Amino acid sequence: MAAAANLPAFLAVGAGAALGAWLRWALGLLLNPIFLTIPFGTLAANLLGGLLMGASLAWIHAVPAMSPVLKLLLTTGFLGGLTTFSTFSAEGLHLVQRGEWGWLALHAAVHVAGSLLMAWIGYAAFTAWRG
């Protein structure tokens, strides 16, 4: 198994993914009851994930010598576990099944545009903070 040959990377991805998934789950528990048509927990996870991905990429670019294992922990692991394209897809399918086309369009637009905007903000904020 290739992953066994690189145990630190394997463990970093797994640990990061567990932490990210736990945060996503907690956001769902906290925010999904607020508005039942569009689950805010998934939206919050995707927007926060976009923001943190932008900041992480800026950090990675600012520190070329950063450990590849730390990069994997942050991006593939934690942010991969936090962000929720499969959950987003399932929630979109539920809107389709209920014929809620307007909510579906809003759901998709806010997740995609919002995540891209948050990634840009995260990158810009880290770059400005770093100077």
Curated annotation (Swiss-Prot):
Q: Which UniProt keywords apply?
A: Cell inner membrane, Cell membrane, Ion channel, Ion transport, Membrane, Metal-binding, Sodium, Transmembrane, Transmembrane helix, Transport
Q: What is its main location?
A: membrane
- Which residues are listed as membrane-spanning? 3-23, 34-54, 62-82, 101-121
Q: How is its activity regulated?
A: Na(+) is not transported, but it plays an essential structural role and its presence is essential for fluoride channel function.
Gene Ontology CC annotation, any one: plasma membrane
Disulfide cross-links? none
Where Na(+) binds, per the record, is at G80, T83
UniProt GO MF annotations: fluoride channel activity; metal ion binding
What Pfam families does this protein map onto? CRCB
Known InterPro entries for this protein?
FluC
So which domain of life are we looking at? Bacteria
What does the record give as the reaction this protein catalyses? fluoride(in) = fluoride(out)
Choose any GO biological process term that the UniProt entry carries and state it. cellular detoxification of fluoride
* Family label: Belongs to the fluoride channel Fluc/FEX (TC 1.A.43) family.
Q: What does this protein do?
A: Fluoride-specific ion channel. Important for reducing fluoride concentration in the cell, thus reducing its toxicity.
Q: Which HAMAP family match?
A: FluC
UniProt name for this protein: Fluoride-specific ion channel FluC
Give the gene symbol: fluC
